Amino acid sequence: MFQQQNQQLVIGKISEILDATDSSYAEKMTEMLDSAKRIFIAGAGRSKLVGNFFAMRLVHGGYDVSVVGEIVTPSIKAGDLLVIISGSGETEQLIAFTKNAKKVGANIVLISSRASSTIGDMADGVFQVGKQELYGKVVGMPMGTVFELSTLCFLEAIISHIIWEKGIPEEVMRERHANLE
């Protein structure tokens, strides 16, 4: 019984956050992704792991994507898009990435729990997942768990939107999936 209560707590909180997220974001994010020459994904800690999920699905969708910090990541240039995932929008390393990307003329998107932040002030687009007041302390969901899981679901919904809008068959996505595993 206790396990079911925990599952309902997690699912309920994620649903609450996603219900409070602007429904126009899917279209706006898709437009920004489509207009980019290349896409770079950055985050720190568990937010970076969420970014890895998103990067993989974007590759399956046919986008040219790199994850910041990997040894094979190329340099970002004008016309590229840097997608930053940061609950606070204040992570020092991600602020530095944002400044460097801005300096070369890349566009910046911030996915965050906050509408206003240092990174958000430099970004070309801010996608606030939920509303700040919904991120209070939740017993059983420590530290950034609520943001990370909500963002993972939000980004999966973006991928679903892209697949639907572009009519990408799963077979095509499978062909783009890694085959050296």
Regions found by a protein language model. Give the residues of each.
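Generic N-terminal amphipathic, Lys/Arg-enriched alpha-helix
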Residues: 1-19
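Residue-level recognition of alpha-helical structural elements
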Residues: 3, 22-25, 102
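Hydrophobic packing residues in well-ordered alpha-helices of helical domains and bundles
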Residues: 7, 26-29, 51
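Generic secondary-structure signature for well-ordered alpha-helical cores
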Residues: 16-23, 63, 160-168
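A short, well-structured juxtamembrane/interface segment
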Residues: 19-35
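Glycine-rich phosphate-binding loops that contact phosphosugars or nucleotide phosphates
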Residues: 38-153, 159-162
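A short, charged, Gly/Pro-tolerant segment at domain boundaries
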Residues: 163-181
